[in-house]
Design a protein with these regions (language model features):
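Active-site recognition of the HExxH zinc-binding catalytic motif
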Residues: 47-59
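Metalloprotease/metallohydrolase-associated module, dominated by Zn2+-dependent proteases
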Residues: 1-44, 60-90
Length: 90
């Protein structure tokens, strides 16, 4: 899968736990890649993808969000989208 974020194409890659070295997800800014651990549940992978995307947005727009802010906003946005399926049609 590929995501276009702030004009850049990011490749989403699912990696082994060895490659992830204890991380669930990684935003690789210099490579335009998002790595997600392939050993996690689909729900955890989805959360990780949103989380890493928010890190990229924070960096691109100089928002300077800390880890806690990224975490809370990740869950808030997922809830918004899942609780309002018609939102994507607007």
């Amino acid at each position: 899968m590929n995501l276009k974020i702030c004009g850049l194409n990011y490749e989403v890659l699912y990696k082994s736990s060895d490659e992830m070295q204890g991380n669930i997800g990684l935003a690789r800014f210099n490579d335009q890649q998002i790595w997600i651990g392939n050993c996690f549940s689909a729900q955890t992978q989805k959360i990780a993808l949103w989380h890493e995307t928010l890190h990229i947005l924070s960096d691109a727009y100089n928002l300077k969000m800390n880890e806690e802010q990224v975490k809370f906003l990740t869950h808030a946005l997922i809830a918004l989208v899942e609780d309002n399926p018609d939102l994507k049609n607007e």
